């Protein structure tokens, strides 16, 4: 399956002809954003040369207190329309200007997700400093996760955003529309179900019992045909390479993490019993648990 940006094969996927699995461990979030938006890695320096304006930061700081208690996705939808009031350049819909607006939105989302006050050295660094400041190893993991989720061109979230973009809306409005779709049960709801399943399972010794209980109850996620939450993908018949890589990277950094050990057992049992492999959502939830990210952290990275 192929679009203007992404190509999916049975076991790989590509951004503008570049293997996304390789990009996840060799390039920065900013470089991959430049590739997706312009087709050129080197455009990173010009696109990300400007920080958020003082007026945008002032607006963000003013509403920070009202974001307390919200999940990152909820906070995004509160913050974006308000900060957009101070970004008049967002109404410039020429391709280069839209890409530059995209960089400002990325910087803003990184701050909102983590409750940060000022953008730091790159998107991944901002997220790591806000969520896992005590562990520099988390930066590479978070960067890989963001890159693996950089383009969602084939799902309903992106389709919604494209429809809004086709009406000549600003990038802020486009992103807000995509976030609305993302909060549905097929995305945010899916990560919540995975989290609930892992909490219920609790330990590797309970995995087979938990899977058996799911099978007996006949539970599934509408539209995905999954029995075990986070497994099976219609786009990847031999397994979602994004989920596989993210699980491997997390295990390399935190091999003894209870979250990793549980995920490994779930993966083994599900493949043995059902022949299904983990999706990107399962990888994100496992990484979020290993890093002890706040509620909603996994789906925020997907966004």
Model-predicted segments: where are they?
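Hydrophobic alpha-helical bundle cores within soluble ligand-binding/oligomerization subdomains
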Residues: 1-303
């Amino acid at each position: 399956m192929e679009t203007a940006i992404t190509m999916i094969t049975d076991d790989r996927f590509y951004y503008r002809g570049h293997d996304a699995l390789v990009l996840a461990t060799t390039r920065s979030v900013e470089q991959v954003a430049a590739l997706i938006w312009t087709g050129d890695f080197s455009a990173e320096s010009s696109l990300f040369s400007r920080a958020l304006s003082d007026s945008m930061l002032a607006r963000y700081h003013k509403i920070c207190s009202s974001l307390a208690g919200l999940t990152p996705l909820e906070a995004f939808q509160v913050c974006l329309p308000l900060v957009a009031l101070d970004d008049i350049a967002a109404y410039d819909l020429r391709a280069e200007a839209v890409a530059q607006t995209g960089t400002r939105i990325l910087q803003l989302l990184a701050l909102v997700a983590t409750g940060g006050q000022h953008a730091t050295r790159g998107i991944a660094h901002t997220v790591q400093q806000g969520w896992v400041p005590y562990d520099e190893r988390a930066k590479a993991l978070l960067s890989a996760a963001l890159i693996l989720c950089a383009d969602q061109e084939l799902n309903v979230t992106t389709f919604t955003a494209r429809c809004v973009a086709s009406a000549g809306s600003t990038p802020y409005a486009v992103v807000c529309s995509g976030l609305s779709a993302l909060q549905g049960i097929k995305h945010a709801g899916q990560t919540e179900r995975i989290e609930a399943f892992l909490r219920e399972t609790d330990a590797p010794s309970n995995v087979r019992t938990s899977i058996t209980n799911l099978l007996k109850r006949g539970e599934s996620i509408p539209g995905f045909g999954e029995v075990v939450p986070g497994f099976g993908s219609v786009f990847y018949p031999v397994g979602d390479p994004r989920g596989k890589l993210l699980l491997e990277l997390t295990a390399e950094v935190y091999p003894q993490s209870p979250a990793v050990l549980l995920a490994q057992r779930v993966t083994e049992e599900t493949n043995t019993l059902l022949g299904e492999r983990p999706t990107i959502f399962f990888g994100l939830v496992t990484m979020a648990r290993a890093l002890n990210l706040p509620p909603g952290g996994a789906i925020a990275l997907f966004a």
